[in-house]
Amino acid sequence: MISVGQQIIFISSGAALGALSRWGLGLLLNPLFSAFSLGTLVANYLGCLIIGVFLAFFWQYPQCSAEWRLFFVTGFLGSLTTFSTFSAEVIENLIQQKWLAGLMLASGHLLGCLLFTALGVFIWRYWQ
């Protein structure tokens, strides 16, 4: 078992790369469509694709070290996009045939995120 300090280093290292990747995608792709945040969409889609690959890999090779999981999944993908983690949790429930849990999780995240985003906009406008 690795220490908490080592875990923090693995997560932080991955997170730095994920954040820089997301920022770079925004710089590269957002100017292509001024009314649409293409960099964010690509970051979310790419993060979901990558987390799917890593989940399948870790399922097949459960002996893979916790350090790699912390670096890639928690750090890099968590920083690149939180949508990938949400997608992984829903898919894990569905693969395990926990249909209701998967549906509730998907609905809760989607509706909750939309509602909290709207609430944030409302709060900002109210306090202006």
Swiss-Prot record:
User: Which InterPro entries would you find in this protein's record?
Assistant: FluC
Provide the activity regulation entry from the record.
Na(+) is not transported, but it plays an essential structural role and its presence is essential for fluoride channel function.
Described function:
Fluoride-specific ion channel. Important for reducing fluoride concentration in the cell, thus reducing its toxicity.
- Note the topology in the membrane: Multi-pass membrane protein
Kindly list the positions annotated as binding Na(+): 78, 81
**Out of the domains of life, which is the source?**
Bacteria
Task: Answer yes or no on keyword Glycosyltransferase.
Answer: no
Q: What is this protein called?
A: Fluoride-specific ion channel FluC
Classify the main location.
membrane
Record keywords, A-Z? Cell inner membrane, Cell membrane, Ion channel, Ion transport, Membrane, Metal-binding, Sodium, Transmembrane, Transmembrane helix, Transport
Q: Where in the cell is it found?
A: Cell inner membrane
Reactions catalysed according to its record: fluoride(in) = fluoride(out)
GO CC, sorted alphabetically, is: plasma membrane
A Gene Ontology biological process noted in the UniProt record is: cellular detoxification of fluoride
Name the source organism.
Answer: Pasteurella multocida (strain Pm70)
Record has Ligase as a keyword: no
Q: Which family does it belong to?
A: Belongs to the fluoride channel Fluc/FEX (TC 1.A.43) family.
Question: Membrane spanning segments where?
Answer: 8-28, 38-58, 71-91, 103-123
The molecular function GO annotations come to: fluoride channel activity; metal ion binding
